[in-house]
Regions:
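Flexible "cap/lid" loop of the alpha/beta hydrolase fold
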Residues: 158, 167-200
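Acidic catalytic loop of the alpha/beta-hydrolase fold
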Residues: 254, 277-281
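Short beta-strand/loop motif that positions the catalytic acidic residue
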Residues: 266, 272-274, 278
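Alpha/beta-hydrolase fold catalytic core
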Residues: 2-3, 12, 21-76, 99-100, ...
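Active-site loop/oxyanion-hole signature of alpha/beta-hydrolase fold enzymes
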Residues: 104-144
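Hydrophobic, aromatic-rich cap/lid helix
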Residues: 231-259
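Glycine-rich beta-solenoid repeat tracts in large extracellular/virion proteins
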Residues: 355, 362-367, 380-385, 401-406, ...
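Conserved HGGG/HGGXW glycine-rich cap/lid loop of the alpha/beta-hydrolase fold
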Residues: 67-112
Length: 480
């Protein structure tokens, strides 16, 4: 049952205060939001009704709201981390509710829903969404997710593919392997753990873990001596003690989850929107999703950070309505990448900095260079030696070795490499995300010990066939 938002006593019967229409935007966005949108107007939307229900999966209460014509196609909005909850979508809600039946909610642990120390994991949130939406709109709907909500939307579309007609994702958090994600998410998400470690001491933490799980592990190389993160997350006592807010629990669960298998199962056409200045969720994630999701389109919002709905509500509303209203056979829904085209042009960088490569090449050699970027390249072979290189959205199809990396540090995103050997690494550090490696002899050959991080990567060779999402050190002579 969804209660009409109105007299406070109707909700006090359930033991909680009546939710307010007025939300609280992040402080950096308040001026923009106040200038363009009155949150109190949400209550006056046609078909608006809201209230609290018994929260499936988690227990307690969950705030759920609907707006717009009930006989119109449904749009479900899934918010990200932060206690604003569904209020983050308020600036775009009037535009959506004019044409669509909109369902939004505060996920358990956030906003006006019950806060606790439950396991706020992606899988449990997906079950919650399935139950809540199923009670209100059985059948296919359009699914929109922001930040953590974007990751939940992906997992939902993979888990219940018949439910989702289209996806729209904004600044998706998570997805990358936790080591690749560490610089901008891991430490922020575990701020409380570090504080507790400094207060109670590592011995006390180890004692609690030993009692709960009979084992201890370091937090990989990030925080030597810290508790194992999965034990911390899944043990009720440790979770309540050290992860003392739903945001921290949900953030840690998000970082530790592996969304690669889900991404491979998503079939819904997808638009991806990203704020140019997002310091929380890397654009690299958007490139991975664009490359690995079928019929996906990627758009940058130049004036936005992590919350485009707040900083550019008019632009986001326009893009949302454009996407939702497109015919199923529109080229923006069915577009496929162009085929690899041969070229006789060769590219070379030697002892230089800041060089950029784009377009078609027979081969590219990078020797002793720093700050080199390859973007939208199609080539027959690439050699990187003693260099610092970023490679994005690149295809290499070789007769011998597609990509050879020697004594270098390379970040590779949304690329395809194929050849007798797809990747040959010697004494290098390579961070791969959304990369497919296809080798007739080997997908990966290690000529010298190398460190590699794999996020949502594919490997196809006579030696191995499958999915890579791990951080490993590979010894000389390894073939995969």
């Amino acid at each position: 049952m969804c209660l009409r938002l109105g007299p406070a006593h109707a909700l006090l019967v359930l033991g909680i205060a009546a939710p307010s229409c007025r939300g609280t935007a992040p402080q950096a966005e308040v001026a923009t939001l106040a200038a363009e949108f009155d949150p109190d107007a949400i209550c006056a939307l046609p078909g608006y009704r809201a209230g609290v229900v018994n929260a499936p999966v988690f227990g307690g209460e969950a705030f759920v709201m609907e707006a717009g014509p009930t006989d119109a196609p449904t749009v479900v909005l899934v918010h990200g981390l932060g206690d604003s909850g569904a209020r983050d979508f308020y600036p775009v809600l009037p535009s959506l509710a004019a044409l669509y039946h909109v369902v939004a909610f505060d996920l358990p642990g956030f906003g006006r829903s019950t806060h606790g120390h439950e396991l706020y994991s992606p899988a449990r949130y997906v079950e919650f969404i399935h139950a809540v939406v199923g009670q209100r709109r059985p059948g296919p709907f359009n699914l929109v997710g922001h930040s953590m909500g974007g990751a939940l939307a992906l997992l939902y579309a993979a888990s219940f593919p018949m439910d989702v007609s289209r996806l729209l994702l904004l600044d998706v958090a998570g997805i990358l392997h936790q080591k690749a994600y560490a610089n901008f998410a891991l430490f922020a998400g575990l701020e409380s753990v570090l504080g507790v470690l400094g207060t109670v001491g590592k011995d006390a933490v180890r004692a609690l873990i030993a009692e709960a799980s009979r084992e201890t592990q370091p937090l990989q190389p990030f925080i030597p001596g810290a508790p194992d993160l999965r034990v911390l997350l899944h043990n009720d006592l440790l979770r309540a003690t050290f992860l003392d807010s739903p945001s921290r629990i949900a953030a840690l669960a998000l970082i530790l989850d592996d969304f690669g298998p889900a991404i491979a199962q998503v079939r819904a056409p997808t638009w991806i929107l990203w704020g140019r200045h997002d310091a929380i969720a890397s654009q690299r994630t958007g490139l991975v999703l664009q490359a690995r999701l079928p019929h996906a389109q990627f758009y940058i919002l130049e004036a936005s950070g992590h919350d485009p709905m707040l900083s550019e509500p008019a632009a986001v509303s326009q893009l949302m309505l454009r996407w939702l209203g497109m015919p199923a056979d529109h080229p923006a829904v069915t577009a496929a990448p162009p085929p690899l085209a041969p070229s006789a042009r060769a590219g070379r960088c030697e002892n230089e900095s800041g060089i950029r490569f784009t377009g078609d090449y027979s081969q590219i050699e990078i020797v002793g260079c720093r700050g080199v970027r390859l973007k939208d390249v199609r080539a027959a072979a690439i050699l990187v030696r003693n260099s610092d290189v970023v490679i994005e959205n690149t295809q290499v199809s070789a007769q011998a070795t597609a990509l050879q990396v020697v004594g270098s540090r390379v970040e590779i995103t949304a690329c395809d490499f194929s050849g007798a050997v797809a990747l040959d690494s010697e004494g290098s550090e390579i961070d791969l995300a959304g990369v497919n490696l296809r080798g007739q002899r080997a997908g990966i050959h290690v000529s010298g010990s190398s460190q590699m991080i794999f996020s949502v990567c594919g490997l196809d060779s006579p030696l191995n066939h499958g999915y890579l999402h791990d951080a490993v050190e590979l010894n000389v002579g390894t073939d995969l």
